[in-house]
Design a protein with these regions (language model features):
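Cytosolic, membrane-interface loops and tails of multi-pass inner-membrane proteins
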Residues: 34-64, 121
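Interfacial segments of multi-pass membrane proteins
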Residues: 58-63, 84-88, 124-154, 167-176
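Membrane-interface helix termini and inter-helical loops of multi-pass transporters
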Residues: 89, 177-187
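Loop-to-transmembrane alpha-helix initiation sites
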Residues: 141, 157-165, 184-193
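Membrane-helix interface "capping/anchor" motifs
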Residues: 114-120, 149-166
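Alpha-helical transmembrane segments in multi-pass membrane proteins
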Residues: 20, 24, 29, 33, ...
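Short, Lys/Arg-enriched N-terminal segments with co-localized hydrophobic residues
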Residues: 1-12
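Feature marks short, highly hydrophobic, charge-poor N-terminal signal-anchor/signal peptide-like helices
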Residues: 13-19
Length: 193
């Protein structure tokens, strides 16, 4: 366990956040839909809606491609969060949850803005779902019900996505207040943002 106080402590934690974000970004660079499309001779970013995510893969390449893209994009965020948890849990037990969040956010950034594809990736829905599952699994059931329910009723993935993010934020506030997030109180405001 590493304990630094004052400026050195803040600098170390900033460094840990940057490392976690970087790890997440690297995982997010794995563009499942783009790579699957390329294996089929198609650049998914020049077809359909033009993004490399699950919905466009499903529409352009079919159900198999959609499921593979969803699974890959979901898993890359989960793996990034789990790796950061393993790397930092002993050194920063009170801060590991915030570092997990940075890793998940980094994965979404890498997915949405991959540098090697001129920052043109997916929309981050499946990747965000993976982050939610890994960082705050308590929030996942309500998010899943809202997502599936809203799509079944309206056929709008974008509405489902908005409901998931809104629901996640509300649930994190509630779970944080109730102490279910297992995060040091000093990090709660940052976790909420």
């Amino acid at each position: 366990e590493i304990h630094y106080s004052g400026e050195k402590g803040r600098a170390v934690m900033i460094g840990a956040r940057v490392i976690a974000l970087g790890i997440g970004y690297l995982f997010g660079l794995f563009q499942t839909g783009y790579l699957y499309g390329k294996s089929q001779g198609i650049d998914i970013r020049s077809e359909g809606s033009g993004n490399a995510g699950t919905t466009n893969s499903l529409r352009v390449l079919g159900i198999k491609a959609g499921l593979i893209t969803f699974a890959g994009d979901l898993c890359k965020a989960i793996l990034a969060v789990l790796l950061v948890k393993v790397l930092f849990r002993n050194a920063y037990p009170d801060a590991v949850k915030i570092l997990e969040l940075y890793a998940g956010f980094g994965a979404v950034l890498g997915h949405n803005f991959p540098f090697y594809l001129k920052f043109k990736g997916g929309k981050g829905i499946a990747c965000t779902s993976g982050m939610i599952l890994a960082v705050c699994p308590l929030a996942a059931p309500v998010c899943l019900i809202l997502f599936i329910g809203s799509i079944a009723i309206t056929r709008y993935v974008s509405l489902g996505s908005i409901l998931v993010v809104t629901s996640y934020l509300v649930q994190v506030l509630i779970f944080g207040h109730m102490g279910y997030l297992h995060i040091d109180a000093a990090y709660l405001p940052e976790f909420y943002v």
